[in-house]
Amino acid sequence: MAAELVEKDIAKVASGKEEGVRLVVKALISSGVAMSIAGTSRPASGGEHKFSHWLDSNCETPALHGEQCGLGSIVTMYLHGGNWEKIRDTLKAVNAPINSSELGIDDDIVLNAFLNSKEIRPQRVTILDKSNQKQIEEAALATSVIG
């Protein structure tokens, strides 16, 4: 629901005006409510967050958390067989990074983050934990997150 709120009115969000900011805040509150109901951050935190936390722990200069999660969302959605292009296009519409170069982190480090993210919160199993190296490399290349 939270992502849909932003996606359906991405032009308003991209404008940076109050109406767009309100949409983002509404989406964040919605996400927070889902986490409160579940009693865990799981509804809003999957492989993309484990990817981001790995970068935070292993990069000399990590990027912004949301930007890292955005990149992680592209690859994890690809692995799920979902509409990763919609995520990429939504990020692009707000001038967010959509590949490792734009994120400012080398391809090798980004790929290592996807491959080694299972080290982060190992009790939280995500699509990255269930994917092998070949699948992850294919996803990162097919989505142009690396390459």
Language-model regions, residue ranges each:
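C-terminal charged capping/lid subdomain of soluble metabolic enzymes
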Residues: 81-147
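Active-site segments that bind and position negatively charged phosphate/pyrophosphate groups
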Residues: 1-95, 101, 105
